[in-house]
């Protein structure tokens, strides 16, 4: 009877569902990162886009790409050609597409850079998690591998910088042969991406900027420095008098930076006590003797983002020390506004050629890279020429 009941239950049970044939699943592919260099360009042009609106105005385009070779008209023509709609807003994606179409032999280079960037970030994350728990031998191996990786990358960077500097020097040479020298005032900004630290300049003991710099001031250069420092003292006196007779300090007014002697203030080795120097009158014959008797003064005004002030201070001190040590730099000083985030940098050079060589030096390029990362607005660069006779003073 029990067996009959069990048989009845088995017959009444609904049939078990038949297994459905499995459809083969294709492995999910990683999202396409886009053409080689596209990710890199996006990061580069994002820093050039100060408004973070995904577009570059011509002013932002000029600030980032001006290299002293292409004229303003040529830059405008390039901007309009990429834009295609004759607007003043160029989408960064269009800019990425434009450069992606012109990569040529650098296509595999940029693709390798993007892969290298991902690999380095992954290795750094793993090192951060595993290094402290690793044995001493494993820690030693990690330090060795990291040090050798840095060495190999620095060797590649040196080769690339050498080629870049050579091409830029040639381009500036061709441009100077075709154009006359004239005073100019323009907005200027860094034109390259990268975050190379200024310490790479200070660690180089064999590099000397400019092929004609000897590193030792001649007697004539010492006289130049003496005259420039005297003029600087005269300017200081005049500014003090203006502040004394004018209204009291107000927000946004100037104050000398730094207020005490420090690495960022370079009065020069030939400063003399103030003796109320006077300027000699201009003589017409001095103007007819050519550009050799003209001094160039470069004024750079910057507005630093609050979160980048500390890094900017360090970079500014390094740059002022580096610039003041150049044999053709007559004087360099920095001024800080009372708002704490605005600065004016003054550089006096013996001639324009020396200043332009300095602009192409590793120290100057490193400082410009710091600027593009930490400024809240494009910096303003103004250059003015002074006849040499204006700087001749006497103490009688």
UniProtKB/Swiss-Prot annotation:
Residues 296-385 form the ABM domain. GO terms for molecular function: calcium ion binding. Phosphorylated by NEK2. Strongly expressed in heart and skeletal muscle, moderately in brain and pancreas. Residues 206-217 have a biased composition (Polar residues). Residues 36-71 form the EF-hand domain. Residues 181-190 are annotated as: Required for interaction with APBA3. Inhibits the interaction of APBA2 with amyloid-beta precursor protein (APP), and hence allows formation of amyloid-beta. May enhance the activity of HIF1A and thus promote glycolysis under normoxic conditions; the function requires its ABM domain and may implicate the stabilization of the interaction between HIF1AN and APBA3. This is N-terminal EF-hand calcium-binding protein 3. It comes from Homo sapiens (Human).
């Amino acid at each position: 009877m029990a067996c009959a009941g069990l048989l009845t239950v088995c017959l009444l049970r609904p049939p078990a569902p038949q297994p459905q044939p499995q459809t083969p699943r294709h492995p999910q592919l990683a999202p396409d990162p886009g053409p080689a260099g596209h990710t890199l360009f996006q990061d580069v042009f994002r820093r050039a886009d100060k408004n973070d609106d995904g577009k570059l105005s011509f002013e932002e385009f000029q600030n980032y790409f001006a290299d002293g070779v292409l004229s303003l008209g040529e830059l405008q023509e390039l901007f309009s050609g990429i834009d295609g709609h004759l607007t003043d807003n160029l989408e960064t994606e269009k800019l990425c597409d434009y450069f992606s179409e012109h990569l040529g032999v650098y296509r595999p280079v940029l693709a390798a850079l993007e892969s290298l960037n991902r690999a380095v970030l992954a290795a750094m994350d793993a090192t951060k998690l595993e290094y402290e728990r690793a044995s001493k031998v494993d820690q030693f191996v990690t330090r060795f591998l990291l040090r050798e990786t840095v060495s190999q990358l620095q060797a590649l960077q040196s080769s690339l910088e050498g080629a870049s500097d050579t091409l830029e020097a040639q381009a500036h040479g061709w441009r100077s042969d075709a154009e006359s020298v004239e005073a100019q005032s323009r907005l200027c900004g860094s034109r390259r991406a990268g975050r190379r630290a200024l310490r790479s300049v200070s660690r180089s003991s064999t590099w000397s900027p400019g092929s004609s710099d000897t590193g030792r001031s001649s007697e004539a250069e010492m006289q130049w420095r003496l005259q420039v420092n005297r003029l600087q003292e005269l300017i200081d006196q005049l500014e003090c008098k203006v502040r004394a007779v004018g209204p009291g300090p107000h927000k946004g007014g100037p104050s000398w930076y730094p207020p005490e002697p420090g690495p960022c203030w370079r009065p020069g080795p030939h400063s003399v006590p103030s003796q109320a120097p006077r300027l000699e009158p201009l003589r017409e014959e001095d103007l007819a003797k050519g550009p050799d008797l003209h001094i160039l003064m470069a004024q750079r005004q910057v507005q630093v983002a609050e979160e980048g002030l500390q890094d900017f201070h360090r970079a500014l001190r390094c740059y002022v020390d580096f610039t003041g040590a150049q044999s053709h730099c007559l004087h360099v000083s920095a001024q800080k506004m009372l708002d704490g985030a605005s600065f004016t940098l003054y550089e006096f050079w013996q001639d324009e050629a020396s200043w332009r060589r300095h602009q192409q030096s590793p120290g100057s390029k490193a400082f410009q890279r710091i600027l593009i990362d930490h400024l809240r607005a494009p910096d303003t660069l103004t250059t003015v020429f002074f006849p040499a006779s204006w700087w001749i003073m006497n103490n009688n």
